[in-house]
């Protein structure tokens, strides 16, 4: 897995940084570009971290919405 030159953070530090955001700490949702996740940390490692934290995520149109809590997700429409 090659690390992109665009991020000064290691993959672990990048993950720590997004999950240290106010929204994540409060159990809210955060959004990231799918390509940034793949570029900075890798899909497999990202999914492993979500599972470790008990979080869920959905992807649509190149965006990943991360639910920073363990509540069920209910699709409305």
For the regions a language model picked out, list residue spans one by one.
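Generic recognition of long tandem-repeat/solenoid scaffolds
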Residues: 30-35, 63-67
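Long, compositionally biased
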Residues: 5-9, 72-77
């Amino acid at each position: 897995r090659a690390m992109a030159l665009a991020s000064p953070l290691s993959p672990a530090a990048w993950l720590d940084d997004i999950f240290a955001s106010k929204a994540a700490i409060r159990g809210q949702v955060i959004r990231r570009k799918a390509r940034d996740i793949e570029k900075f940390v890798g899909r497999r490692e990202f999914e492993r971290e979500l599972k470790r934290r008990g979080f869920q995520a959905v992807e649509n149109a190149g965006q990943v919405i991360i639910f920073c809590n363990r509540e069920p997700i209910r699709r409305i429409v």
